[in-house]
């Protein structure tokens, strides 16, 4: 089952219920559009306002930027080897730990969508689409090869609204 887009209030609820470390991981993912695995592989030497990341999934390089408040939080959190150290400081925090915490937080608030860390990447894409209205800019920001894949992300809010309208229509309630 694919992960789904979250409304801003749902993002805020999920973030509020995460552990401090996982909240910082997800704030970073939300601001940069990076996949959680790439966020977890950040090393302290990379923490600058703009830096390059090689994406684990694709092997492609991309530049990301961080605003000062987030950059400061990341620097304060960073260990010697990793920005997000694991129990063994020579290894980074795990994707599985973040995934479980995001799932737990979403369930605690009874959020009906299939929420996972990747949902935050869709939120990032939708926000970029709203800001720029340019699918090519969103495609480049996500480092996608295909515009059609980017459209799935960038229009995820509209897909969610349509899903709710269909659900309301089938239950006999008036769609708004």
Please provide the spans of the model-predicted regions:
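Active-site/catalytic core of tyrosine-dependent DNA strand-transfer enzymes
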Residues: 67-112
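DNA/chromatin major-groove-contacting recognition/catalytic segments
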Residues: 1, 5, 9, 65-69, ...
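Basic, Lys/Arg- and aromatic-enriched nucleic-acid-binding interface segment
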Residues: 4-32, 36
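Short, polar N-cap/turn motifs at the start of nucleic acid-interacting alpha helices
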Residues: 45-49, 134-154
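Active-site His/Glu-centered metal-binding helix of metallohydrolases
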Residues: 120, 124
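Active-site-proximal segment of tyrosine recombinases
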Residues: 38-39, 114-115, 125, 132-144
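Conserved tyrosine-mediated DNA breakage-rejoining catalytic core shared by Y-recombinases
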Residues: 8, 20, 32, 41-72, ...
